[in-house]
Amino acid sequence: AVLVSVMLSQGQANAQFGFPRMNMDSLNALTNADHADMMSKIGVTSLRPGKDGYSTDPAIGANYDQYIANPYINYPDALTTFDGRKVKNAKMWFKVRRPELVKVFEDEFYGHIPANVPDVDWQTVSEEKVMVGQTPCICRTLAGVVDNSSCPEISVTIQADIVWPESAGNNIPVIMEYGFAVGNSPMMMMPMGNGPQRKPWKEQVVERGWAACTIVPTSFQADGGHGLRQGIIGLCNKGEYRKPDDWGTIRAWGWGVSKLLDYFETQPQFDATKVAIEGNSRYGKTA
């Protein structure tokens, strides 16, 4: 399947905070415990204080002037391999350069997806006829139930929904978003932001005869260190702390979308080779 991603840097800034409300002291305690465990594993005893984004004192405030940011100027050439060879053709890119770049991002940024990630069983929770703007549509709510036989104490379900025009036929493109609610709710249909109001994105999508899909990342991996022993990461680790090169939340969110793509490949209504995804803030980085 071909997946196109779009990152939205503006809009609803807190879109990724979709986890249920919990006692903040408990969340902080769990986050701090996870942080301390990882610090111990990598042999780091302290971190330098971060800059204050609100202070005007140059000694402690964040810098917003690009001219004095001391940018890194020696960027490596994307078309030169780590051992100094020039990439001469597409075959060399896909066989040599691209894999070594992917490995760097896995090692240094996103972590590795474990080999023991369990299967996902996609189930239809509901399917109903709805109106999206002026377009008669079908809305299907999905639950991707993850096999937890290896650790029954941890249950994981991917929440998603997809809406498409009744008259669309088969093999239609899909526009996906990382969101925080499923179903034909007013929150999912309303315009966002303070600028000129346009039609909600789902309305624009279905008017073109396409499908609009929302996946809820926090349904299968919480947005924060407090949830790293739960969700899909916790399930794969059987409730234990992560190793330094294990995957993190953003990688886990991406895994969830890959499972949804697998589902699209089994459904004649959707063309899994024509899928785009967008998100805001951390959801944008994930997309």
Q: PLM features: residue spans?
A:
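Bacterial N-terminal signal peptides
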Residues: 1-9
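Cap/lid segment of the alpha/beta-hydrolase catalytic domain
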Residues: 170-272, 278
